[in-house]
């Protein structure tokens, strides 16, 4: 195996994590980690979750901060997996700048729709609605956009091949298993993603020109310098080029198995057959009832000529070359009028070329 260079990334040691995806998971750990692992149970309600009094008290920051709050270690672990899986794929598709932009947009619109349903539920006395928290609403919004705009017709979910349009709804049902997660907020997030994917809301979209300008500003310029994580450019051409390099890596950038070099087309066929570079002898001409003239002794070619006495008429004969490299050994002499007679060029000599006493080997 060829050894990779010192500057090459080692293969299959760890997957590439996009920059914004990593910092989203890190921010969730910094916000929820101290409350979960340092404070005593039971925990007091967090001041960053999404509640109906958030707008009444002008706590508008809760429209975004709720996606970093987790009230259970299991939900924190599930949230980290969701961020890595769904947010990472979305960032690789749209770029780091647009990923951060859509994270905020999806969080705000999902929160507004959630608060509207919560207000209707409280007025109609349908029951108490659980507070929205965690990254799952934004993840479902990203999944909705990806599902609508994807060209894939089928996808693999839980070991089953299902139509891609059913993937968000199957995962929405599975979100019931995540503890302390608002199912209503997940529905709101999925609705926002599907609506955005179907209508192509250009009014709230971020253009590529603006994304390229933001790539050079803080904090994205600092994120670009961190080589441990993958910063995805806002240019669609650069993303396609990076994807092409990933699918077709440059020769020498990955370990390869050493093997014998193939023969290049520039080598003529005669060089592979003759070590001395000599050309093959021309085919001998033959007239009916006359013995063919054998070529000089050429051990490298191994050519032999077969004379067949059963041509168009009994007295005619035809000569054609036999398979190269086939050897049947020296056999005892046989009658000249045998059905098939082989005149071996390896046994003939230039002096006996015109005589009929050359060696004969019967063909099976």
From Swiss-Prot:
What compartments host this protein? Golgi apparatus, cis-Golgi network membrane
Q: Where is this region: Disordered?
A: 242-282, 317-364
Q: Where are the transmembrane segments?
A: 11-31, 63-83, 100-120, 158-178, 184-204
Q: One GO molecular-function annotation for this sequence? A: signal recognition particle binding
Membrane topology term: Multi-pass membrane protein
Which terms does the UniProt entry file under GO BP?
Answer: endoplasmic reticulum unfolded protein response; ERAD pathway
Q: Which key words are in the record?
A: Golgi apparatus, Membrane, Transmembrane, Transmembrane helix
Task: Give the primary localization class.
Answer: Golgi
Q: Which Gene3D superfamilies match?
A: Rhomboid-like (1.20.1540.10)
State a GO cellular component annotated for this protein: Golgi membrane
Q: Where is the composition biased (Polar residues)?
A: 267-276, 317-329
Q: Which family does it belong to?
A: Belongs to the peptidase S54 family.
What's the protein called, per UniProt? Rhomboid domain-containing protein 2
Q: Which organism is it from?
A: Homo sapiens (Human)
Which gene is the coding source of this polypeptide chain? Answer: RHBDD2
